């Protein structure tokens, strides 16, 4: 599948995967891309399959000359599902914001290298973290 004449989906998937362990290929559908990050383990004493994490996820969609995004911060539960939740621990919040900003910057740079912009989706008004100026 080609998203634009210059950017086939297969090449974009390779570029996105090179950004780090964030791309979830199984959750990428057609022109929708899904990234997540399990940033802070809640209880490391549990067996790996029972652990829960604080983290976040980003969803991208292409449009003319750009990708739009929405993101959420929250809990990745032991069932393997994301739930948007308010983070009450300031240390965890700082870690999540730092991780999200770092990924956002790398993603923005990668997209700029192929002459694409990264912008918030038009209906994404409730941004919990300011990602760019």
UniProtKB/Swiss-Prot annotation:
Essential for activity as annotated region, ranges: 99-122
Subcellular location as annotated: Cytoplasm
Protein origin, superkingdom: Bacteria
Gene3D superfamilies: Sigma factor-binding protein Crl monomer (3.30.310.230)
Chief location category: cytoplasm
GO CC annotation terms, alphabetical: cytoplasm
InterPro entries the UniProt entry points to: Tscrpt_reg_Crl (IPR009986), Tscrpt_reg_Crl_sf (IPR038208)
This protein's UniProt keywords: Activator, Cytoplasm, Transcription, Transcription regulation
Pfam family, one: Crl
Record keyword Transcription present: yes
GO annotation, biological process: positive regulation of DNA-templated transcription
Reported function: Binds to the sigma-S subunit of RNA polymerase, activating expression of sigma-S-regulated genes. Stimulates RNA polymerase holoenzyme formation and may bind to several other sigma factors, such as sigma-70 and sigma-32.
Protein family per UniProt: Belongs to the Crl family.
The protein's name in its UniProt record: Sigma factor-binding protein Crl
Gene name per UniProt: crl
């Amino acid at each position: 599948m080609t998203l634009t004449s210059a950017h086939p989906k297969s090449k974009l998937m390779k570029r996105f995967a090179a950004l780090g362990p964030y791309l979830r290929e199984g959750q990428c559908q057609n022109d929708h891309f899904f990234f997540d990050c399990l940033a802070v383990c809640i209880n490391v004493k549990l067996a790996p399959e029972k652990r829960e994490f604080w983290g976040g996820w980003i969803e991208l969609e292409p449009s003319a000359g750009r990708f739009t995004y929405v993101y959420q911060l929250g809990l990745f539960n032991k069932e393997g599902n994301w739930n948007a939740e308010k983070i009450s621990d300031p240390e965890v919040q700082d870690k999540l914001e730092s991780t999200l900003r770092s990924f956002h910057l790398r993603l923005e740079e990668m997209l700029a290298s192929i002459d694409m912009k990264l912008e918030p989706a038009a209906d994404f008004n409730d941004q919990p973290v300011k990602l760019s100026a």
